Amino acid sequence: MEKLNLHGKTGFIIGGTRGIGTYKYHNTCAEAMLLLDGDAYIHVAPAGPADRIPYDAVEVFRVPKGTMVTLRPGVWHHGPFCVDTDSLQTLIILPERLYAYDCTVLTAPEADKLRIEA
């Protein structure tokens, strides 16, 4: 598993892909996502060891436009995936500069990546 260094990054790009291969979590704070202009898929997995994604526990939810999702500290997740469009505006609520001091990101090997089939 490749561990990414996101020091200095403050956001991410949301595209039209439906492949799940990146997971992140924060130890010290919750994260909130507000879907502004469309439905989205969001994947989550329960907290666990920092060096291992619990693939057997990953769940994907379809979240309607206008819904606020709150993720507790330690929950594996990543940005939302578009449902019916190629792009999606999402308000992400996190403490300032969080990615510099509290963001663990892992990328799954190709064989362990999931694909959303709608």
Predicted regions and their residues:
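Short beta-strand-centered segments at strand-helix junctions
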Residues: 71-74
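Flexible N-terminal pre-Rossmann segment of NAD(P)-dependent oxidoreductases
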Residues: 1-10
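Active-site region of the double-stranded beta-helix
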Residues: 17-65, 78-118
